[in-house]
A protein has these predicted regions:
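A generic structural signal for short coil/turn motifs at secondary-structure boundaries
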Residues: 57-58, 110, 167, 296-298
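ATP-binding N-terminal substructure of ATP-dependent carboxylate-amine bond-forming enzymes
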Residues: 1-125, 138-146, 397
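Acidic/histidine-enriched active-site and ligand-binding environments that engage anionic O-linkages
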Residues: 146-156
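ATP-dependent carboxylate activation and anion-phosphoryl transfer catalytic cores
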Residues: 2, 7-26, 34, 48, ...
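Conserved beta3 strand of the protein kinase N-lobe
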Residues: 133-134
Length: 459
């Protein structure tokens, strides 16, 4: 078993990893920027090292500082969490070269799946359905036009090196290709340092469904029940749930089989998530995230498996010993991302002093957060403040529990997305289940009696 893990992250995920280490008897090292000197992960870890000033480029993305911290403290492994360096193949390679165990797949696998065009080719070669589109990157607007002539419009141009909506443009007709190609390529180059793009057929009414996998070095792969992540804003997930509501059993089985085929073709090790779109009764591969997901607690709640602990065991060379019953969903779980954003003012980012922090409790309620009363939320990083996860015997019960827990959750000192989640849980379409990724885009947020309400545009 690895003996000391440096956690190359901050916030709630750093706390999550440190707690898993404690339960396994593994010592932990926190790294922190000067903006996070009062952070809980800095306090809870066995050791901590300041790695730089507030900007992420000078701290949490500062590879030499992180490697030096590992050497200084005698850490023998690095857990990257999510975001920052979690899917940076170069960082994983450096860890490998200096003898640090990277808690995740190999640098080669990260690089292969990090190039979205190559990942698409890899999936197709493994027999996984992919959306009709280009074979690899498109080198010119003319290539995009050729794909359009073959598969039809609309198309979506995507950055090969990234995600999150950056370097992405929807093209409705051939006349739009030139500008869309140039703009997508330019944005991809600025954001990811790589301007290459590829093209897929654009599907309008789709759901975002993903499969959580674990794989060890002994050839064992475990695939958990699917998560539905369709409630999004500008390609950023806000609510995730498992199992996916109103999903045919044959589709569920197909998603599991496709995920296992892809993971098997990669000789994968660690935790990963295979992401798909589901539309018109068919599913297609989007990408594979070679890291722990923000929404991993949803799977933990319905399976009883500690995914972070399993990551650490796999990295230590251990075998997966997950009972078969953990792979069938035990009830229903929903996760709500509580962000420091004002939904009433176009999700304006928030920062400042947390005056009151009172998380909910009770049966089937979990809160993963780094907040406390008196904590000052810095403006330099991701807006995630907390994750509220609720679990019940069925979806209806999980929704009721979510309404109660959200109403009980008190954070003051800044605006948050708590009111938005309450509004979603009162929306009739969401309650029916199976909403598409355009769910929020089709609605206006309006204040009514001091509460937010979602109203369908044009209704």
């Amino acid at each position: 078993m690895i003996s000391k893990v440096l956690v190359a992250n901050r916030g709630e995920i750093a706390l999550r990893v440190i707690r898993a280490c404690r339960e396994l008897g593994v010592r932990s090292v926190a790294v922190y920027s000067t903006a996070d000197r009062d952070s809980l992960h800095h306090e809870l870890a066995d050791e901590s090292v300041c790695i730089g000033p507030p900007p992420a480029a000078s701290s949490y993305l500062n590879v030499p500082a992180i490697i030096s911290a590992a050497e200084l403290t005698g850490a023998d492994a690095v857990h990257p969490g999510y975001g920052f360096l979690a899917e940076n193949a170069r960082f994983a390679e450096i860890c490998e070269r200096v003898g640090l165990t990277f808690v995740g797949p190999s640098s080669r696998t990260i690089a292969k799946m990090g190039d979205k065009a190559e990942a698409r080719e890899t999936a197709a070669a493994a027999g996984v359905p992919v959306t009709p589109g280009s074979d690899g990157p498109c080198e010119s607007a003319d290539e995009v036009k050729r794909v359009g002539a073959e598969v039809g419009y609309p198309l979506v141009i995507k950055a090969s090196a990234g995600g999150g909506g950056k370097g992405m443009r929807v093209v409705e007709a051939e006349a739009e290709v030139e500008d869309a190609y140039l703009n997508a390529s330019r944005e991809a180059g600025v954001t990811f340092g790589d301007g290459s793009v590829y093209v897929e057929k654009y599907l309008r009414r789709l759901r975002h469904v993903e499969m959580q996998v674990l794989a060890d070095s002994h050839g064992t792969t475990v695939t958990f029940p699917e998560r539905d992540c369709s409630v999004q804003r500008r390609y950023q997930k806000l609510i995730e749930e498992s199992p996916a509501p109103d999903l045919p059993e044959d589709v569920r089985e197909g998603l599991m089989d496709a995920s296992e085929r892809l993971v098997g073709s990669l000789s994968y090790e660690g935790a990963g998530t295979v992401e798909f779109v589901y539309a018109d009764g068919e599913f297609h591969f989007i990408e594979m995230n070679t890291r722990l997901q923000v929404e991993h607690p949803v799977t933990e709640m319905i399976s009883g498996v500690d995914i972070v602990a399993e990551q650490l065991k796999i990295a230590s060379g251990g075998r997966l010993e997950i009972p078969p019953e953990a792979l069938s969903p035990d009830g229903h779980a929903i996760e709500f991302r509580i962000n420091a954003e004002d939904p009433g003012r176009n999700f304006l980012p928030q920062a400042g002093l947390v005056e009151v922090y009172n998380p909910p409790g009770g049966p089937g309620v979990r809160v993963d957060s780094h907040l406390y009363a008196g904590y000052r939320v810095p403006p330099h990083y991701d807006s995630l403040l907390a994750k509220l996860i609720v679990h019940s015997r069925d979806r209806e019960g999980a929704v009721r529990r979510g309404l109660r827990a959200l109403d009980e959750f008190a954070i003051s000192g800044m605006e948050t997305t708590l009111p938005l989640h309450l509004a979603v849980l009162e929306d009739e379409e969401f309650l029916r289940g199976g909403v598409t990724t355009s769910f929020l885009a089709q609605r206006n947020l309006e204040s009514e009696g001091g509460l937010l309400r979602l109203n369908v545009i044009g209704s």
